[in-house]
Amino acid sequence: MTGKIVFATGNAGKMKEIRLILADLGMEIYSMKEAGIQTEVEENGTTFEENAVLKAKAIGEQTDAIVLADDSGLEVDYLNKEPGVYSARYLGEDTSYRIKNQSLIDRLDGVPEEKRTARFVCAIAAHLPDGRMLTTRGTIEGIIGYEERGEGGFGYDPIFYLPEYGCSTAELSMEKKNELSHRGKALRAMKEELKKALEA
């Protein structure tokens, strides 16, 4: 099987995380841009898994590499698990995360800590050159903070607070974030699935 993986993202932060976690597979890992693939896939699934599979399949049909795609988002329990699969599109795709984060803080104004529970969810799909599809999921539980904290991370990280660590995910070191994060968990699970699939 091919020694090449294409990850369906243009996000530099994600690529850094992915390369760190999948390094010991001993495969070359490319972003879509690096692989010269420019497909826009409409993410119209109703679950994170459906969206990841849609992306992996659409891009997998254009290359003989293994294609990994993820869909991830934030579920806030008090807001009926919003923004969920619409996390990237919440308040519009071009809206800055500073505005998105402030909106969620405002919507939880006056809500006590025990009702501010939330989780990051990440589903990853792998489309193999022989047409097989693998999926994994990872989650991390936390609460929505009262303000943005930390300069690391991206997206909703500054308002996602981990009580047991006393900080937001934007305040974690890259190593700790990879260990704890939803994407880190889903990627490590996918790494094991890929090892099994490549041996088969």
Each model region followed by its residue ranges:
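Anionic-ligand binding patches
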Residues: T2-V6, A12-A200
